[in-house]
Design a protein with these regions (language model features):
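Surface-exposed loops/turns
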Residues: 51-52, 97, 112, 197
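Extracellular recognition modules
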Residues: 58, 118-122, 210
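Extracellular glycan-recognition surfaces and repeat-rich motifs
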Residues: 1-29
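Extracellular carbohydrate recognition and processing domains
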Residues: 82-114
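Extra-cytoplasmic beta-strand recognition segments
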Residues: 1, 28, 38-73, 103-110, ...
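Cellulosome-associated attachment modules in secreted, modular CAZymes
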Residues: 147-215
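Extracellular carbohydrate recognition
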Residues: 122-140
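Short, surface-exposed beta-strand/strand-loop-strand elements in extracellular ectodomains
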Residues: 73-79
Length: 215
């Protein structure tokens, strides 16, 4: 299937996959990664994307394996006037397992004198598979439709189900509601509700939270 000229970076391989998509029927699967910088890369045409000028860039990413959150980068690799390879950040986004998140910068200036340009997507420090969809370059200032950003809490505290940074009776009430409902809509609440870290949220977690609050 057509990967739209995207290629694997480093040890990574790429292929189209119908497992998930942001738009259409398929997305680009990036797999076989052995380091965080192993990702997907695509050459930029210097006639379409002129060094020294501004452009809008966007790409949507998602993943299913690994940690609850992951940090993704959209970057530009290029050769400068001295012949040295440089790496410049276009956009950063923190993603959540099973969700789509958008890497976007409406006004990115391609460094003047850049040659052999490639845009690429990588992670901060993980090696799990991930997916890319709707990677687009456009006129500067263009707001490219996409998944948008995800509001990720700075810290996740076991038992802090309402994510306000404090464990109190409101969290116990939320835990009881979650137990009655069979779970939580918020993935972060679901994560911290598993107080005993059994990988399953159940009555034992509610009891442990209740006991903690009674101390």
């Amino acid at each position: 299937a057509d990967t739209c000229s995207w290629e694997g970076r480093g040890a990574a391989g790429v292929m189209t996959s119908g497992r998930t998509n942001y738009a259409g029927k398929e997305a680009l699967l990036v797999q076989d990664r052995t380091a965080a910088w192993n990702g997907a890369t695509k050459a930029l045409n210097a006639k379409a994307f002129v060094p020294g000028k501004e452009y809008s860039f966007s790409a949507n990413v998602s993943y299913f394996d690994g940690d609850l959150t992951d940090t993704f980068y959209l970057k530009l690799q290029y050769t400068d006037a001295n012949g040295d390879t440089q790496y410049d950040s276009i956009a950063t986004a923190k993603g959540v397992q099973g969700k789509w998140v958008q890497l976007a910068n409406t006004n990115y200036t391609i460094p003047a004198g850049a040659k052999d340009m490639q845009i690429y997507v990588e992670t901060a420090d993980t090696t799990n598979n991930f997916y890319i969809d709707e990677a687009i370059g456009a006129v500067a200032g263009t707001v490219i439709p996409g998944a948008g950003a995800i509001d990720v809490p700075e810290t996740l505290i076991p038992g802090d189900i309402n994510l306000d940074g404090v464990i109190d009776g409101f969290d116990l009430a939320a835990a009881k509601r979650g137990l009655a409902a069979g779970g939580f809509d918020n993935v972060f609440s679901a994560k911290v509700a598993d107080v005993n870290k059994s990988t399953v949220f159940d009555a034992e977690d509610v009891q442990e939270l209740s006991s903690f609050l009674m101390k």
